[in-house]
Amino acid sequence: MTEAGRRGDAIGTGQLAIVGLFVTALVTAQLTAAKVLQFGLPFSLPVTGDALVLPGAALAYALTFFGSDCYAELYGKRPAQRLVNVGFVMNFVMLALVYSTIAAPAARSSVDPQQFRTVLGASTNIVVGSLLAYLVSQNWDVIAFHKIREWTDGDHLWARNVGSTASSQAIDTVIFVSVAFAVLPELGVNPELGLPTGVLLSLMVGQYVFKLLVAVFDTPFVYAVVGYLRSRGHVASRPRTAD
């Protein structure tokens, strides 16, 4: 194989790896969103107290922003927007597959159908809240990422990675928690999921603090991925203008 052929294979593999990570993290987030996690802290914070409370999807979902930021940096604004929109459609594919499996008749030797439904069948509140939060926050992430790139003339990748993710994660957190656990229960959709205002704020703050920490600590990995793939010929060495 020629050098050009090897470089072309590397480009294809690297791009597919980012897309694969993005979609895998996104689907995992949907499947783990119903579990609420609680991590004890050695100190007390305003609102959250001595524990961080957050949805089980927080880690997986934070990885989607890592993937989309790498993709936006390497391939541009419009390809990143297409990645986000394809991911949105894949959510519906995943939900269709899960709910069709739940609806299908179970063999006698199978796991209990009700347990299966409980584990994999996310409530309407979780589905609607997460899809709406995804659509708004991920598109904002791409827009903010490229605006910051324009302002910094292509320098300071850390600023656009942290800045775009911090703002988009705030949007995502507020939309998801408020829709799933306040707005829809108030409208009569699974009212048992409704949470008091204090708990809602604690859930929002805990989730956002965790996501913000992930955004800060994943910055060296963004540099590593972008640097490696640029060295393999994925893009011009340092883009100076947004698409």
Which residues fall in each region the model found?
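Haloarchaeal acidic low-complexity proteome signature biased toward cell-envelope/secretome components but also
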Residues: 1-20, 229-243
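C-terminal ends of transmembrane helices
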Residues: 2-6, 66-78, 222
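Alpha-helical transmembrane segments and their helix-start/interface "positive-inside/aromatic belt" motifs
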Residues: 8-20, 72-87
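Alpha-helical transmembrane segments of multi-pass membrane proteins
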Residues: 23-39
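Alpha-helical transmembrane segments of multipass membrane proteins
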Residues: 27, 31, 69-70, 96, ...
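Interfacial/capping segments of alpha-helical transmembrane domains
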Residues: 35-47, 53-54, 104
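Structural signature of hydrophobic alpha-helical transmembrane segments
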Residues: 52-63
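Membrane-embedded alpha-helical bundles of multi-pass transporters/translocases
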Residues: 81-83, 87-94, 100-137, 147-148, ...
